Amino acid sequence: MRTLLLYVVTAVAEIVGCYLPWRWLKEGGSVWLLLPGALSLALFAWLLTFHGTAAGRVYAAYGGVYVAVAILWLWCVDHVRPSAWDLAGVALTLAGMSIIAFQPRL
């Protein structure tokens, strides 16, 4: 459960860190959005160091959680209801993430 929570917090940090500069560029937001965006990306990189396995495996497993959090962001922040295809994609990526993240350690 701790691993999953860490993945979710890491994904939120990455999404916020990318969303704020996007909002500045795409929607003419304040240039001050870049500061919390940069801090959020720094937090994202720092959080990755807490994942206790090889970096490649962390990134692969984290990708599934990122997809799920991004679709949740779509719904909660962008106010776009996810389609059945979105939800099927999330289910598939979380299944893949679970296989990678929770494999037996030999």
Swiss-Prot record:
SUPFAM superfamilies with a match to the protein in the record: Multidrug resistance efflux transporter EmrE
Keyword Cell inner membrane: yes
Keywords from the UniProt entry: Cell inner membrane, Cell membrane, Membrane, Transmembrane, Transmembrane helix
Subcellular location: Cell inner membrane
Membrane topology, as annotated: Multi-pass membrane protein
CC annotations in GO: plasma membrane
Transmembrane regions listed in the UniProt entry: 4-24, 30-50, 58-78, 82-102
Main location: membrane
Domain of life per record: Bacteria
Similarity field: Belongs to the UPF0060 family.
NCBIfam families hit by this protein: PRK02237.1
Name of protein: UPF0060 membrane protein Bphy_5052
Species assigned in the record: Paraburkholderia phymatum (strain DSM 17167 / CIP 108236 / LMG 21445 / STM815)
